[in-house]
Regions:
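A short helix-coil junction within the Rossmann-fold of NAD(P)-dependent oxidoreductases
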Residues: 1-12
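Residue(s) in the substrate-gating loop at a strand-loop-helix junction
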Residues: 21
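Short, flexible catalytic-loop segment of classical short-chain dehydrogenase/reductase
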Residues: 25, 59, 63-74
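Active-site loop immediately N-terminal to the catalytic Tyr-X3-Lys motif
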Residues: 26-32, 91
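Active-site helix of classical SDR
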Residues: 37
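Alpha-helical segment proximal to the catalytic Tyr-Lys
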Residues: 49-54
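Catalytic Tyr-x(3-8)-Lys segment
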Residues: 78-98
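C-terminal substrate-recognition "lid" of short-chain dehydrogenase/reductases
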Residues: 95-119, 124
């Protein structure tokens, strides 16, 4: 990306979009490694944005909660149902196109930089299910 020609009048050369998870801040019992790895991605966001700013490269992380995905298809129905019960609004898993819509907004909006964007319908995972 550093070698890219600037794409905008501000000199932007691109954006790195990373994916974390609501588990970075709301990890469940048994998710120590998963939560730690997603927390590491979230923690990387601001320092990476600062390091790459001089090159005109942005860094943003999207932290989704429960979304329809290959991973959630593997969840037992009971677990998925209990997670859906703690969704505030909308009361359903996120849709892939909703994730894509946010990713597109990140690409298009140069002021989004160095941020972790929760995409979670106000869901906060309980400490126990």
């Amino acid at each position: 990306m550093v070698k890219n020609e600037p794409l905008t009048e501000d000199g932007e050369r691109g954006v790195i979009i990373m994916v974390s998870s609501s588990a970075a801040t709301d990890g469940q019992p048994g998710q120590v490694a998963y939560s730690a790895s997603k927390g590491a991605v979230a923690s990387l966001t601001l320092p990476l944005a600062r390091d790459l700013a001089r090159h005109g490269i942005r860094a943003v992380t999207i932290a989704p909660a429960l979304f329809d995905s290959a991973m959630t298809k593997l969840m037992p129905k009971k677990v998925k149902a209990s997670l859906e019960r703690v969704m505030e609004f909308p009361v359903r898993p996120g849709k892939p196109e909703e994730f894509a819509s946010l990713a597109l907004q990140v690409v298009e909006n140069s002021m989004l930089n160095g941020s972790v964007l929760r995409l979670d319908g106000a869901m906060r995972m309980p400490s126990r299910m």
